[in-house]
Amino acid sequence: MSEATPFGIYLHIPYCKAKCRYCDFYSAPGARGVPQSYVDALLRELAKNTRRPDTLYFGGGTPALLVPAQAAALIEAANPLPGAEITLEANPDVVTLETLRGFRAAGVTRISFGVQSADDAQLRRLGRTHTAAGAAQALAWAREAGFPEICGDIMLALPEYTNAEFDRTLALLRDGGCTHISAYLLKVEPGTAFYRNPPAGLPDGDAAADFYLYAVQQLEAAGYRQYEISNFARPGHEGRHNLLYWNCSDYWGVGPAAHSCVGNVRRFWPDDVQGFIAGTVAEQREGDCTSEDYLLMQLRLVSGLNIPAYERRGGRFTTAQRVFMRQCVGHGYAVWDGEVFRLTPAGMVVQNAILEELM
């Protein structure tokens, strides 16, 4: 592959202070930092790569448990291209102004905070370990540290949720200088504390859809342009790394539970942090990237599915599916100009049902 072809690297940092009650990601809770042995294992794998990335993403877990010197070593080993986007996820309560300055000096260009809510009781219910005031402080420190991109997450349709809670959370992120906001619905996944003991007051599907549509409206009004189902940005501040996923470009994941798609081949690492450190586990082939993957990812984007590009990947819509697509337009779920089929916010609410008909 040419370096002109977009390429990103994802580094999984599974360590976190505590497991949130809704989290189904592979993680190692109870950590106060990231063991150097784990960083060394990442460096070992990065040394095998010869392709310089356009984006580098530290995900977790809580990557901000790294010390800046560890992050700097990993960034240097990844050898990103000039102007690369380098993202680090953080919880508000694990950073200080000093550590944020250290991450910025190490080369991180984009800091992403899991704020979720401006309601302290809600944060406790979720199992989060920060407060709304702590989130506001972390955002202020990020501005002072000089990050050009500051991102915040909002969870929607939480227990006992109201639009007023969303408004307060949006105000916290907007006033905190966020250039990018992710807003996504709570999903109660198997294996989570919420699945074992569901919280009272969860909104039903119709109410959750209303919360989502309200969030889209308010984010747009606040100057955050929607570009993907759950992602909104000031113009020019869209997340470049996740766009690699949604455009089915090449990305390489490193670390336990990390996934890759390079050269149309999907691979993954087993959920085994000790095996990864010891070098006794290896990436496994998961399958090929298909035209259905492309359809699934492209319909997440506001820009929609380019049908000629889909057909070049081997995809085809039947006559019945094209009739269904026209029905989606008639119901206000989609816009279709013949070449590009894209979902409206109302269509994004029922995206899964639409995909069932098109795949």
Annotate each PLM feature.
Residues 4-8, 27-316:
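C-terminal scaffold of the Radical SAM
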Residues 11:
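Conserved N-terminal Rossmann-fold NAD(P)-binding element of oxidoreductases
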Residues 14-27:
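Local cysteine-cluster metal-coordination motifs and their immediate loop/turn environment
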Residues 300-304, 333, 359:
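Hydrophobic alpha-helix feature that most strongly marks membrane-spanning transmembrane helices
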Residues 315-329:
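Short amphipathic alpha-helical interaction segments
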Residues 329-339:
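A short, conserved structural fragment
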Residues 340-344:
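Minor-groove-contacting beta-hairpin "wing" of winged helix-turn-helix DNA-binding domains
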Residues 346-359:
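Short, amphipathic alpha-helical interaction segments positioned at domain boundaries
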